[in-house]
Amino acid sequence: MANWLLNVSEKWLRPVYDVLHEQLCRKPVLHADETTLQVLKEPGRSSTSKSYMWLYRTSGCAKQAIVLYEYQPTRKAEHAETFLQGFSGWLHADGYQGYLYFDVLPWLNLFLRFCDDWR
């Protein structure tokens, strides 16, 4: 059954995901975050190793919400860079250094410092 589910997902859901991904990258404002998860019995990795689920979504101002998840085995910045290739708007993210390749985000560090000082 798992194999059937994978085949159906690749054939029928992947094209939908790709269209949503294209539309997402055209939006002027996005949010991104990543969180850890543990995948049991993943080939080539121990059951205690950390994997990451990356989340990308439109802002609350968007007429239609688009929320996409992407599994990655690591937290390398290249994953966000590859996923958001072609995106040229504002990206709201936490202080993770992997997002700093965006031109807009140097202001993020200043904002975070301001918030820390204010507290």
Regions found by a protein language model. Give the residues of each.
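Catalytic center-proximal scaffold of phosphoryl-transfer enzymes
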Residues: 1-119
